[in-house]
Amino acid sequence: MKIGDILRKGVFSISFEFFPPKTEEGERQLFETIRKLEKLNPTFVSVTYGAGGSTRDRTRNIVQKIHEETNLTVMAHLTCIAHTREELIDILQDYKNIGIENILALRGDVPRDKPDWRPPKGACKYAKELVELIRKEFGDWFSIGVASYPEGHPESPNLEWEVKYFKEKVEAGADFSITQMFFVNDYYYRFVEMCKNAGIDISIIPGIMPITNFKQIRKFASLCGATIPQSLIEKLEKVEDKPEEVKKIGIEFAINQCLDLIEHGVPGLHFYTLNKSDATLKIYEAIKDKIPARST
């Protein structure tokens, strides 16, 4: 089932993101998580793709296993900057062959520890170029998602530039978007309003990261430029050495964040699960009565 088609019908989307584990035990734990979250009847799940194509085979194998062993609609992430166009076409053809219809088209991170690193000759240097390549080579076979950044990508000079580039990805053929994680809903609302004013009309699904490990989230937020409210930082700092208290505060914050987003008419919620189900299940349980009807 194509995610873009579902969203265009106005169906409220609930989705979960996973990453491909490095070990057999990690994979066993992932599928334990998937089985628990599958009961929530998500619109789709997605599987990340490592920097520089480092998880190429693992991502592909997990995507195929979810596709074949569950009833879930699965979307494969694909980063382009470290691949030639020929490699990208091979990867996409393989996904088409096994019946995958949804791709999240991303540029991917430039290696921070390799200042002299350059993309391979003929690579797609931007996500927009990957979207164009997919449409050129595969037409409408794939529903294409792209990333969006309510506070601006760390490399963006300003939010106006961010919206302009986002619009280029949409015009290239993107069907929907998932945002980078954020903790201040007003930044999301501002971004969506700017997009509407720029003539962008695809669904922009908020990305939700439940805080269960303060140190880890601080690092993630710093890398992607997401603002954590000072009031939340102060609460978490007081219990930093008490993991269960951190988790409790983080889940409560995410519940309130999601309820506010639902009240403001968002098209869905995308949860960054980090391959764990507990926090997401608790959040869903608390918000489920407020979620709009989800039948297709």
Swiss-Prot record:
Cofactor(s) needed for function: FAD
Keywords linked to the UniProt accession: Amino-acid biosynthesis, FAD, Flavoprotein, Methionine biosynthesis, NAD, Oxidoreductase
Reaction(s) this enzyme catalyzes, per UniProt: (6S)-5-methyl-5,6,7,8-tetrahydrofolate + NAD(+) = (6R)-5,10-methylene-5,6,7,8-tetrahydrofolate + NADH + H(+)
Per the UniProt entry, the signal peptide is none
Positions bound to (6S)-5-methyl-5,6,7,8-tetrahydrofolate: 109, 180, 216, 276
Question: What positions constitute the catalytic site?
Answer: 17
Residues that, per the record, bind FAD: 49, 51, 77, 107-109, 127, 149, 153, 162, 169
State the CDD domains in the record: MTHFR
Name by which UniProt lists this protein: 5,10-methylenetetrahydrofolate reductase
Q: What is the lineage of its organism?
A: Bacteria, Pseudomonadati, Aquificota, Aquificia, Aquificales
